[in-house]
A protein has these predicted regions:
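Conserved nucleotide-sugar donor-binding subdomain of glycosyltransferases
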Residues: 75-115
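A short, glycine/small-residue-rich beta-strand->loop->alpha-helix junction that serves as a flexible
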Residues: 12-25
């Protein structure tokens, strides 16, 4: 990695719809306009269909979650306990942070992530 460029990591929990990840992708595109050559890695629970990502932006899909009618977060498609899914998602996020080494970590909407899944990463950073 060329450490002369800005590395930005973004997080969108995205348990319902695509609004959060779309907002982060808009911010990422604007960031590249203002700081050409930057690298932006977006971690999200949903993958927007047919998203044309410019050079410098990429997206990592986290295992999906959903918010049920009582406001509780649950695995969307995997038949595992939410604590196990939290561990999987948290581990992916932490691994990306340790290898990508972002200069900036932007979290959309839920400051410590769903179930607090960002706490290990925030502590590391």
């Amino acid at each position: 990695m060329n450490r002369n460029t800005l590395h930005v990591m973004m997080y969108s929990h995205d348990g319902f719809g695509l609004g959060h990840v779309q907002r982060n992708l808009g911010i990422a595109r604007r960031l590249l306009e203002l700081s050409p050559g930057s690298n932006v890695l977006v971690l999200a629970g949903t993958m927007p269909p047919d998203t044309d990502l410019p050079a410098g932006i990429d997206l990592i899909k986290l295992p999906s979650i959903l918010k049920n009618g009582t406001g509780n977060w649950l695995p969307r498609t995997l038949s595992i306990h939410k604590d196990e899914l939290k561990s999987v998602r948290s581990g992916i996020i932490r691994h990306v942070a340790t290898t990508f080494r972002p200069d900036v970590f932007l979290v959309d909407f839920v400051p410590t992530g769903v179930w607090g899944e960002l706490k290990p990463t925030l502590k590391y950073l």
